[in-house]
Amino acid sequence: MRTSNYLLSTLKETPNDAEVISHQLMLRAGMIRKLASGLYTWLPTGLRVLRKVENIVRQEIDNAGAVEILMPVVQPFELWEETGRSEKMGPELLRFTDRHSRPFVLSPTAEEVVTSLVRNEISSYKQLPLNLYQIQTKFRDERRPRFGVMRAREFSMMDAYSFDIDKEGLEKSYQAMHDAYCKAFDRMGLEYRPVLADSGAIGGSGSQEFHVLAESGEDLIAFSSDSDYAANIEKAEALAPTAELAAATQEMELVDTPNAKTIAELVEQHGLAIEKTVKTLFVKASDEIDADIVALIIRGDHELNEVKAENLPQVASPLEMAEEAEIRALIGAGPGSLGPVGLELPFIVDRTVAIMSDFGAGANVDGKHYFGINWGRDVELAQVEDLRNVVEGDLSPCGQGTIQLKRGIEVGHIFQLGTNYSKKMNCNVLGPDGKSATLEMGCYGIGVSRIVASAIEQNNDENGIIWPTALAPFQVAIVPMNMAKSEEVKAAAESLYAELTAAGIEVLFDDRKERPGVMFKDIELIGIPHTIVIGNRSLENGEMEYKDRRDGNKVAVPVADVVEMIKQKLA
């Protein structure tokens, strides 16, 4: 490709609204342009990278035995009503009606559509296993689109759906897709980790996320220092406490704390150790219990894990904190003064709180706390659950090593759905025993456009992007110095371009009438792995200059050896 025939729209300055490095560099390198909030046009350089990602994903998913199809982006709303997800998805699901007032949605995912397809096309277990996938545009009406294509409203995604006659078959399909993901991400040159995950709105039982490790990642992942255990922060657990409840050494005392409305203020003003405090959080209750509010009690230095909380049957999903007015109407006190002693509401205690003794908590009276609280003596211990986020240094749940935390960008997710969708949508076939059997489903997603941004987060320097070779928009750049003034340089550049192109190598030939400095900056910015510089002085010595984008090394190469050297670099 010649730059004279190409849209090379690079920017010198970083746009003000670009927060993370991938968004900045994708704009500066002319990969994308913003059309509206969360909506981007992919320019030639970006589209070439996107297609590279798609092709690697397609090859590995094909190798796993999946079959490609293409489903509509527009889906009938009635399918979503069949599974009950029409409301569970919330405002992210974009709804609209056609001219005949028939309701539709813009696809954020396709479980309903593919299940509808399979229930009409498959009738016997003999047609299984079956794994169908597509690479298609999706839309989720994000409340706050940010970070460029990392969290856009419209995005490209590979979504696959497996159908098996039994759980054993589902597990085989699931493992095959897990392995395909690993092969795809390995080929892309990404540093990533598969981690245990919560199934969220998709539903089902087991699931794993695949995270590209990056400091800019929105997600925290936890992993053991000495084992293979890894989970996202929503799913991660620490080893359950094994210590017995310590004996009381203090009498419970009511203390005036008028200026201590937070745990930090309580610790600072009254000298309590923070691990000897608890905080009591009031959340909306589900219909499972005869109460409007349920209290969740965690240690003062811990944070509530909202996913763990809303997975409890007593807690409304999605999780909703009680308003202060509601709390005051029930208790007569506000947040900052709440605690378990005398609390006439259902409450659930975190595992770490259940083994605490002599601790402090709000007295359910504004400006007062109890110190020296002990379970059994001052308040009966209620239901005990794992409610908190893990922290660095926690013991790993496998019993090997301690928990470490890193930031990651989720680029893939795989689920064992079981019969969660197939049962609701009557997706049944004739089983081997001659009876009707509900299909076991798995679903699998890869954020194709998000991978592009994630790769940049891992591969950049002060000059721009440093693409892994497998994802680079071009493999080689040819930069002729002052070609317009030198027939020798022009002839050598044209000859090299023809040879490399004939060898099937993807080349960007910078034939612009630009200063060499401008050309070099653009080539480095867009991240082409290998650059050949051609100038009069080097040609007089029978050489061309080779530059490696990743390490910056330059070396003079005999003209006759350049093509072979490039082939070896790309092998």
Swiss-Prot record:
EC number: 6.1.1.15
Localization terms from the record: Cytoplasm
A GO cellular component annotation in the UniProt record: cytosol
GO biological process: prolyl-tRNA aminoacylation
One Pfam match: tRNA_edit
One Gene Ontology term of the molecular function aspect: proline-tRNA ligase activity
Catalytic reactions of this protein: tRNA(Pro) + L-proline + ATP = L-prolyl-tRNA(Pro) + AMP + diphosphate
Entries under InterPro entries matching the protein: aa-tRNA-synt_IIb, aa-tRNA-synth_II, aa-tRNA-synth_II/BPL/LPL, Anticodon-bd, Anticodon-bd_dom_sf, Pro-tRNA-ligase_IIa, Pro-tRNA-synth_IIa_bac-type, Pro-tRNA-Synthase_IIa_type1
Keywords associated with the record: Aminoacyl-tRNA synthetase, ATP-binding, Cytoplasm, Ligase, Nucleotide-binding, Protein biosynthesis
Class of this enzyme: ligase
Function: Catalyzes the attachment of proline to tRNA(Pro) in a two-step reaction: proline is first activated by ATP to form Pro-AMP and then transferred to the acceptor end of tRNA(Pro). As ProRS can inadvertently accommodate and process non-cognate amino acids such as alanine and cysteine, to avoid such errors it has two additional distinct editing activities against alanine. One activity is designated as 'pretransfer' editing and involves the tRNA(Pro)-independent hydrolysis of activated Ala-AMP.
Domain notes: Consists of three domains: the N-terminal catalytic domain, the editing domain and the C-terminal anticodon-binding domain.
Family: Belongs to the class-II aminoacyl-tRNA synthetase family. ProS type 1 subfamily.
Subunit field text: Homodimer.
Name of this chain's protein: Proline--tRNA ligase
